[in-house]
Every structure is written in structure tokens, then in C-alpha cells.
A protein has these predicted regions:
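Conserved Class I SAM-dependent methyltransferase catalytic core
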Residues: 35-48, 350-438, 772
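Conserved S-adenosyl-L-methionine
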Residues: 202-317, 322-337, 350, 389-391, ...
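Non-catalytic, mostly N-terminal accessory regions of nucleic-acid modification and defense proteins
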Residues: 1-220, 289-301, 306, 420-423, ...
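Feature representing long, continuous alpha-helical segments
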Residues: 243, 275, 317-319, 364-368, ...
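Hydrophobic alpha-helical scaffolding
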Residues: 5, 137, 173, 202, ...
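Flexible, glycine-/basic-rich loop-and-beta segments that form/coincide
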Residues: 427-530
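Extended hydrophobic-aromatic, low-complexity segments
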Residues: 325-328, 378-383, 394-397, 418-419, ...
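Surface-exposed acidic, glycine/proline-enriched linker/cap segments
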Residues: 280, 336-356, 366
């Protein structure tokens, strides 16, 4: 198995051009460009199948006649045997015979009979394509016959079998599964280039797949024994990755004198790509393997896993990245009802550790799905090669799904290596991509280690772009990467080794105390009139109705409600100058807010707050309290004196209205606990302080100021841990700060680019001096012109 040559790539490009021209010539006035695929893709599959079945057509018809004559009910196995394939067609037609058929409705009937003659496994493929829905349109446009004729052109071979001349020499090469996938991807790109569909779905080039397969198999090549191996791809597309992986494993086994039986398993949500994958497995004679490929719009790997109880030896995939999985999330119960045990695990001291990413990008969910299918009891365990984009390395804060997944992977020591690929290596995207290699049976020298390889500059350019793909990995490039991967664990400019804990950090929350001054001045108290929210609207309503809101609210409510709905009963065509200036402008307030504004209890509650604040003002005066703690104590005493007991929310509203932040004020105490006489207390960095009052000692905790709240990332390998970092980096700048220990979380991120950053070399002094002299010469010339001009 070799990486496709430039000549092979050109040949595939020529085939894609040929098929595109058929589509553009025949379907331009029948379908919009984005719908060409509904006809062209199933036609490609039909032509491939038709070519394979052509040689045994007569034998199949004879066998069918014999079985019918003898009333044999179960005919599938016998007909497959007659066809020499995992599928067959029992109609009297071939595409060549249909080409000679009449046009119009007769051709339609014959073509439908031809489709109906295929075996049940092919019928499912045609159903996924929804191809029968297109036939009448093609007949009405008089293009069905022309399409059949075009796809039978002797200058192109769409078959997985080579076309040979009379002497047995290959005239036209075969179009294998991966070649078909390349053509398919190019056609999809062209079909959708105007509306930019499927931006997150990228067919994986054969050179990348070959590298992935080698990275997956080569470390265990010597351990492969004769026996059965299961390969799995949870986003299998057209099946190219599974095919290359199967070929690689088979070759390795043969090289080591082993006999292996390989079974392929795949799942694909896109009906078209699933149909092509299944069709190509049938074309390869792998009918049993085709039965292990499941797909369709209702077969999402995330929400409808079809292999939940299976474990696999090797897993390979290029899942969609940057693509929403919200539909899957909803099917799985949404954020509140999510309970899939694949993504909620016991890890560390958390029995419900969540491996659930944000709904905008589910690529790491595919990785979790694979990790849950690793073999636990076999000596070889399981190995995984998967492609991700850069966001999988660092997206997600500590405690969020993406970071949790990285933490779960690294703390279980499953990640072996990450390899950065060249830009523009894929057909439909130029973004940075990375191969992750994982295993649950690491070699000793890899345990608790992760290898990063920067192969982004190792490639050879293509003569002609294939979509956005402008380069490829040559055989030498692939071997260079594999050699580096298999080599000794030592750092080079392109290879770095890390401990798994190097990527971990504590995210700590740094708090500082709230410092307030307070004053019961009339203007501050008046703001409590609108303390229940929507201050601007409440102010407008108050401005119109005043104290009537407290005594006549039921009477005023219909009028206020109409105004809030934007319906004042006025004529919209009334001149602006005739409007009553006392009438507030029309509003259209959402129902939830409107409901609260129309609740008389909120207005009465705010009125009560004003009354309580004025009562406190009578006792405390309107002077400034420099210490909010003193203010609260005096306020409570005033309320107690008048027999008024306030709820915590009421106090909070009043304090908020009459207080403001001031750095010079003492910290606001949240909790004050008296210590026993012999009780030992050592203040730390967690926000608990010692306060002494005479002979009494108190443990004091302060209210945090949310405006001053900050976070810091502390490496897990920080010497001295969090405390040492905090004393060195935080306390010198904020002596009153503390750590909210309950909020500390562990996160993991892999800053790949930072590890391989190469700063631009500084220019030498001679270069700088030469530039300065050159600028001086230019400046002198310009100055001479200016001075000379003035003199003139």
C-alpha cells in the first residue's frame, strides 16, 4: 500500500471533472447546483455495481429461474454465490441494455425494474440516497437516458476492477474505495461551494490516513498474533479510514507470519456517505462487513450508539469538529436530563464527573465514545488514532466538559502522542489539525509521558490544488514522523516529551474584601422605590401615576398593561405634536418582565423599603458611616427598637441603595465566630482571619467584592503548590486577598504552539547600523529638497 502519487491524484481529479461535467451538462436546468448530488452520487454507485455484476449477469438470471421453478423461498445466498459478489441484480436489465431502451415512460418503467432487481442490501443503499424520488424528474426532463449513456463512457472507469485490453493489459486503472472517497469529496465540495454546506465535514486524504494507521499499528507490530481483530470508526464517512486500516493491519500480519481475521465496524449519520461506504464494502466482496456498518439520519454516534456493548482492538476516526451537536443533546435529555453513562463517569473523588462539551462542538465527545469501547482484558488492549482541530487542545475552562475530557484522558494515562499536521492538508479546510494517538497499554517508556511532534513543515506541494488541499505527506514524510514517534524519548526541535501532569493546573479564585461606606441620605433612599427591577420603566410608571400605584393599583392595572404591551389605544397616524406629553412612550415589554411590573406586591414591597429606610434615618441621621459593619449594627438596633424584623433580602436591598465602595473603608464582615479559650486557630490563605477584642478571640470571614474577584492558573507542578504561588504572585500586590478554596478546580490544556514557538532572530548590530545610515541619507536628501525649495 503506497501513498497516492501526483499522477494518481491527477487521475482522480480528471474523474471528478468528468463526472462534474456530466452533472453540469445534463442537470443544469433541472436542478440547482446543490441538488446535483441527489442524482450523481447514486448514479456513480449504480455504475460501479453494474460493472462488477456484468460478467455474471447471465448466470444470476439462470439461477433465479431455477430457484423460482423449484419454489425455493430463501434465495439470497444462492444468488450471491451465482453473482460471485455480496450482492446481485435479478432484473433482465443492465445499464448497457437500458441505454438501448426507448425513452420516456418505457425507460422509466425499465429503469425502476432494474433498481427493483437489486438484492435487499443494495435496496437499503438506494433508500438512503432517496434515489427513486428523482426518477420522474429525470424522465420529465428527458435526461435519464443521457445520464445512463454518459456514465457508460468507455474513456472512464468507475469500477473497482481495472479495464483490460484484448491482451490482458490494464487499459484503465481500478477506482478503489479510497479513490472513490477522494472523488466523492471533490464532487461534494463543488456541489456546495456556493452555499458553503458541510463546512465541518472533511474527508480524510489517504496520506493522512496512512500516517494514522502506521501510528496506530506500528508500536504493537511485534505483538500482533494470529486471531480476530475488530476495527471501529464512529464517524466512518465513506469508509476510507477503515479500508486503509484494514489493509495496513493485514500487511503487518503477513510480514510477521500471522493469520488474522479483521472485522470492520462503523457508524455514519450522513445517509449519502453511509450508502457509499456500504456499497463499496459490497463491491469489495465484504458483505458480512457491510452488515456491521450502520447509518442514516437517525443513527448519530452520540445519541444513538449502535455498538454500546462492543469493545474494539483498534479505533480510527476523523470526527466533525466545530459542528453543533445540540440536536443530539436534546435527544439525550438536554443539559438537565443528560444521563448517558458514556459521558458521566466516576473519576477521582467525583462520582459524576461530566465529560460533556458545549453544544457548539462535539468532537471530543467522539473521543470519549471510543475510549469507552477500549478492551480492558486483552494483553494488547486498544489503540486509537483520531484527528482533531486545535480547539480540542485548549478550549474549555477548568471544570468544563472539554477540560474534563483532557483531564480524564491524561490522568488515566491514555494519551501517547499528538502530531501537528501541515496546514491545507485536507480538501475542505486549511485550519490546523492534529492526530491524537491513545492506548490503554502504554509501553514502559511512555508511561506518564506525552510526546508532541510538530510535523507541520513536513510535506510536499501538489501541482494542482484539490479543493483547499495544496500539499501531501510523501512516503519520506510519513516515515520520518513514524521514526520520530517510535524513537528514543528525547527532545528535538520537532519533538518534545512531557509528563502528563505538565498540562494540568489549578484554577484558583482570588477574593478581596468588600469595603463599603454608608449614608442614609434622601436621594439614595428614594431609589428604593424601584428596587424590584426595571428601574427605568418603573420610574416612567411612577412619574405618571405617583402614589395612586399604592392605593388604586387594581384600577390602574389595565391601562398600565396596555401601555406595556405597546397598545395605548391611540391612532398611530396621529400627528406627533398632538401627543399628550404626560403619556409615556409606547412600550413592548416581554411577558416575564411585564408580569412582575403588574404585580402590585412588588410596588408595595418597594414602598415598605422606603419607609424602613426613613425610619432608620430618624434614628441614625444622614451622616456618613465610614465602617459599614458599624452601620449594620446600628441599623439592626434601630429596627429592633421599633419592633421591625426585616428579611435578609430586604436588608440587602437597603444596604445596596445607601452604600458605596471605598478602598479606605474597613472590610465588611460576613461571619464572626468566637473561639473557645484553648481552641487553636492558625490563619491561612482561605479567608479566615483572627480578630482579638480584649481577652476574646474571633475567627472572622469577610464579604468578597465580586468586582475585585480574579482567577489565577497555578501549574500542578508548581514548587510549593498553590500556597507558594499565592504568596509570591498575589499577596505582594493585594495583601488583603484570599483563596476561595471551595471554588478551586483542576483543568488541563495543551498549548501546542507555545511549546514549539520559535521567535524571530534578532537582527545584528551591523544590520541595524546599516539601516540607520540609509535612513539618514534619505532624510538628508529630503531635507535638502525642502530647504532648497524654501531658498528658491
Amino acid at each position: 500500500m503506497s501513498t497516492p502519487s501526483t499522477r494518481d491524484q491527477s487521475h482522480l481529479k480528471w474523474i471528478a471533472d468528468f463526472i462534474w461535467n456530466i452533472a453540469d451538462d445534463r442537470l443544469r436546468d433541472v436542478y440547482v447546483r446543490g441538488k446535483y448530488r441527489d442524482v450523481i452520487l447514486p448514479f456513480i454507485v449504480l455504475r460501479r455495481m453494474d460493472a462488477v455484476l456484468e460478467g455474471t449477469k447471465q448466470k444470476v438470471l439462470e439461477r433465479k429461474q431455477f430457484l423460482d421453478k423449484n419454489n425455493v423461498a430463501e434465495q439470497d445466498g444462492a444468488l450471491r454465490m451465482a453473482a460471485g459478489q455480496a450482492f446481485y441484480n435479478v432484473s433482465e436489465f443492465t445499464l448497457a441494455k437500458l441505454k438501448a431502451s426507448s425513452q420516456g415512460q418505457r425507460l422509466r418503467e425499465d429503469f425502476i425494474a432494474y433498481l427493483d432487481g437489486f438484492s435487499p442490501n443494495v435496496q437499503e443503499i438506494l433508500t438512503k440516497f432517496k434515489f427513486r424520488d428523482q426518477i420522474q424528474t429525470l424522465v420529465d426532463a428527458h435526461v435519464l437516458g443521457y445520464l445512463i449513456e454518459d456514465f457508460l463512457d468507455p474513456e472512464v472507469n468507475l469500477s473497482p476492477l481495472p479495464v483490460k485490453d484484448a491482451d490482458g493489459r490494464i487499459k484503465l486503472p481500478a477506482l478503489d474505495n479510497h479513490g472513490m472517497g477522494t472523488v466523492f469529496e471533490e464532487l461534494i465540495r463543488r456541489f456546495n461551494e456556493e452555499n458553503n454546506e458541510e463546512a465541518g465535514e472533511h474527508f480524510t486524504p489517504r496520506d493522512v490516513v496512512k500516517l494514522m494507521a502506521k501510528l496506530m499499528f506500528m508500536p504493537v507490530a511485534e505483538q500482533i498474533q494470529s486471531g480476530t481483530y475488530l476495527l471501529y470508526d464512529g464517524a466512518c464517512g465513506t469508509g476510507g479510514m477503515l479500508t486503509v486500516a484494514e489493509e495496513t493491519l493485514q500487511e503487518l500480519a503477513e510480514e510477521h507470519g500471522k493469520e488474522v481475521s479483521i472485522h470492520l465496524f462503523g457508524q455514519e449519520i450522513n445517509p449519502e456517505t453511509y450508502a457509499i461506504c456500504k456499497a463499496d464494502l459490497l463491491l469489495k466482496g465484504e458483505g458480512d462487513e457491510a452488515e456491521h456498518i450502520v447509518g442514516g439520519a437517525d443513527k448519530s454516534t452520540l445519541s444513538a450508539d449502535q455498538f454500546r456493548s462492543r469493545e474494539f482492538d483498534f479505533m480510527i476516526s476523523n470526527p466533525p469538529y466545530g459542528k453543533s451537536w445540540k440536536t443530539d443533546l436534546d435527544r439525550m435529555g438536554g443539559k438537565k436530563g443528560f444521563a448517558d453513562p458514556r459521558f458521566i463517569v466516576s473519576h477521582g473523588d467525583d462520582p459524576e464527573f461530566k465529560l460533556i462539551t458545549r453544544s457548539s462542538d462535539g468532537q471530543l465527545m467522539f473521543l470519549v465514545n471510543k475510549l469507552q469501547k477500549m478492551k480492558q482484558r486483552s494483553p494488547l488492549g486498544s489503540r486509537i488514532a483520531i484527528v482533531h482541530n486545535g480547539s480540542a487542545l485548549f478550549t474549555g475552562d477548568a471544570g468544563q466538559g472539554e477540560s474534563n475530557i483532557r483531564r480524564w484522558v491524561l490522568e488515566n494515562d491514555w494519551l501517547e502522542a499528538i502530531i501537528a499536521l501541515p496546514l491545507n492538508i485536507f480538501y475542505n479546510t486549511g485550519i490546523a489539525t492534529y492526530i491524537w494517538v491513545l492506548a490503554n497499554r502504554k509501553a514502559d517508556h511512555r508511561k506518564s509521558k506525552v510526546q508532541l511532534i510538530d510535523a507541520s513543515s513536513w510535506f510536499q506541494p501538489l501541482r494542482r490544488n484539490l479543493g483547499k488541499k495544496n500539499c501531501e505527506l510523501s512516503e519520506a514524510d510519513i516515515q520520518r514522523i513514524v521514526d520520530l514517534y517510535l524513537g528514543q524519548p528525547q527532545d528535538t526541535p520537532e519533538c518534545k516529551w512531557f509528563d502528563t501532569s505538565d498540562f494540568g493546573y489549578w484554577k484558583i479564585t482570588v477574593e478581596r474584601p468588600l469595603r463599603l461606606k454608608s449614608q442614609l441620605k434622601r436621594s439614595a433612599i428614594e431609589t428604593l422605590r424601584f428596587a424590584s427591577g426595571d428601574e427605568a420603566l418603573r420610574a416612567e410608571i411612577w412619574g405618571k401615576y405617583g402614589d395612586k400605584l399604592y392605593s388604586e393599583f387594581p384600577k390602574l392595572k389595565p391601562e398600565i398593561e396596555a401601555w406595556l404591551k405597546g397598545d395605548t389605544g391611540e391612532d398611530d397616524d396621529e400627528p406627533e405634536g398632538d401627543e399628550d406629553e404626560s403619556t409615556p412612550a409606547k412600550k413592548a415589554v416581554p411577558e416575564k418582565r411585564r408580569k412582575k411590573l403588574l404585580d402590585s406586591a412588588t410596588w408595595q414591597r418597594d414602598k415598605t423599603l422606603i419607609e424602613l429606610a426613613l425610619l432608620a434615618q430618624q434614628e441614625l441621621g444622614d451622616g456618613v458611616f465610614d465602617d459599614h459593619n458599624d452601620f449594620r449594627a446600628r441599623f439592626d438596633a434601630a429596627m429592633a427598637k421599633h419592633g421591625r424584623k426585616l428579611a435578609a433580602a430586604e436588608k440587602k436591598a437597603i444596604y445596596k441603595a445607601v452604600s458605596w465602595r471605598d478602598e479606605a473603608a474597613p472590610p465588611v464582615i460576613a461571619k464572626r465566630t468566637k473561639l473557645k479559650k484553648d481552641e487553636h486557630f492558625e490563619p491561612g490563605l482561605d479567608g479566615a482571619y483572627l480578630q482579638e477584642a480584649g481577652k476574646d478571640r474571633f475567627m472572622v470571614e469577610y464579604e468578597p467584592d465580586t468586582d475585585l474577584r480574579d482567577t489565577e492558573q497555578v501549574p500542578l507542578k508548581e514548587p510549593g503548590g498553590i500556597d507558594a504561588f499565592f504568596r509570591r504572585e498575589v499577596l505582594p500586590h493585594a495583601p488583603d486577598a484570599w483563596i476561595a478554596t471551595d471554588a478551586t478546580k483542576v483543568g488541563y490544556e495543551i498549548s501546542f504552539a507555545r511549546y514549539f514557538y520559535k521567535p524571530a532572530p534578532l537582527r545584528s548590530l551591523d544590520q541595524i547600523r546599516a539601516d540607520i545610515l540609509k535612513l539618514e541619507q534619505q532624510t538628508e536628501g529630503l531635507l535638502q529638497k525642502i530647504v532648497g525649495g524654501v531658498s528658491a
